[in-house]
Amino acid sequence: MKYIVTVLARTLIIAVFLGTSVDGFSQDSKANQPSDQNLKDQSKKTEAPASVPVYTPPKRGAPGGRIGGGTRGTQREVFMLSVLAPDHSGFTTREQPSLYWFISSSTSLPVELTVMDPQGIQPILETRLPAPVAAGVHRIRLSDYNVRLAPGAAYRWFVSVVPDADRRSKDITAGGAIERVEMPEGLKAKVANAPKSDLPSLYGAAGLWYDTVAAISELIEAAPQDQSLRKQRTALLAQVGLTGITE
């Protein structure tokens, strides 16, 4: 019976994902490959300081993107849950990228990560994270689970807080979409010769969302006391409507 309930809950989530907007977020998905032209568009973005990575979204296509998020709660806990994903299918050049998500307060409730196959039928990763889960931004390395993304395929991924394992329809879920693409030729040489501090801006200008988030987050991990880096990430997230994530 628990298996049937779990399958029904997952089916409901996927059905929502394939529909129209949820919680005010649009759901665009698979898009054209990023081009070298995106690298030239950064100069057009004048509203952000030069030190803040400016994200240039790729052209958008079929449905897909961020769902859920916002402040949710149970009788035991109230928290904000969000994936660090755009409101469209975000790009990465990595075969085994990292996925980032945020929870505003610690929780002792079970937290599960699911990555669905491109058809949205079977999970290629389904795991429960160690409890308790601390407040803040969390990183999931797909390499830790031997999960690889195929080029040109869009995957949907979810983080779920499970208040009642017997009633999975009560899960509090946030999700995003990710697609692996080839790195533009003009970007390869720039990345190879650039200092790590320049990588967030280079990836952002090329429309590579997940690589941008990973690059700025890795700088934060290397210098956790540098508040300017955290402010840069906060400003980057705000560009895709992710506010309230200040950690």
Please name every model-derived segment:
Residues 123-134:
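Solvent-exposed serine/threonine-rich low-complexity stretches and specific carbohydrate-binding patches
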